[in-house]
């Protein structure tokens, strides 16, 4: 199972940076939440998640599409820490689903306080609401079982056994 965790830029799509993130006057902060998710996955016998630092690299749509086409990712986790990340989440999810409709897209961070909107207006499949480490591992376990089963459709009821997630059921109802 191929898993990628990405950072999400806070600027609106198309915003032109005046300089590279690494050229700013302040130090670059580590991505603590992403490191924690990866650490929890490793502790639970999942391989190291790939990390695509979209916030730092600030790639265009074609580069993002190429990355996900080349890496054939089964699960993508977004770390969306502020509300201004919404349009970027919408953009990134659209690009990823264009490459592979079956990729499971999980969004975490403060933005998921608006889980209902995210799930209805973007191509995100699951929102993690609150601390994400345990939920992230639960999602990975479920996805591993799903991929091994050979079934096309995720088992929503089984997935909802994972505490701390929100998703839309088959009737488009928001479930926690």
Label the model's feature ranges.
Residues 33, 40, 48-176:
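Glycine-rich beta-alpha loop elements in corrinoid/cobalamin-binding modules
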Residues 21-41:
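Short catalytic helix/loop segments, enriched in acidic residues and glycine
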Residues 2-28:
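Short glycine-rich His-centered loop
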């Amino acid at each position: 199972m191929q898993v990628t965790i990405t950072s999400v830029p806070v600027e609106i799509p198309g915003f032109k940076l005046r300089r590279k993130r690494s050229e700013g006057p302040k130090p670059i902060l580590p991505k603590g939440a992403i490191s924690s998710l990866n650490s929890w996955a490793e502790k639970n016998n999942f391989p190291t998640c790939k990390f695509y630092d979209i916030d730092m690299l600030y790639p265009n749509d074609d580069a993002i599409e190429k990355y996900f086409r080349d890496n054939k990712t089964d699960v993508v986790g977004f770390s969306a820490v502020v509300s201004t990340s919404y349009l970027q989440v919408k953009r990134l999810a659209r690009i990823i689903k264009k490459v592979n409709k079956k990729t499971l897209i999980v969004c975490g961070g403060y933005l998921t306080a608006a889980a209902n909107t995210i799930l209805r207006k973007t191509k995100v499949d699951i929102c993690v609401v609150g601390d994400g480490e345990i939920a992230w591992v639960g999602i990975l376990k479920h996805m591993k079982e799903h991929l091994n089963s050979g079934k096309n459709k995720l088992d929503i009821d089984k997935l909802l056994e994972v505490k701390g997630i929100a998703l839309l059921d088959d009737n488009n109802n928001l479930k926690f």
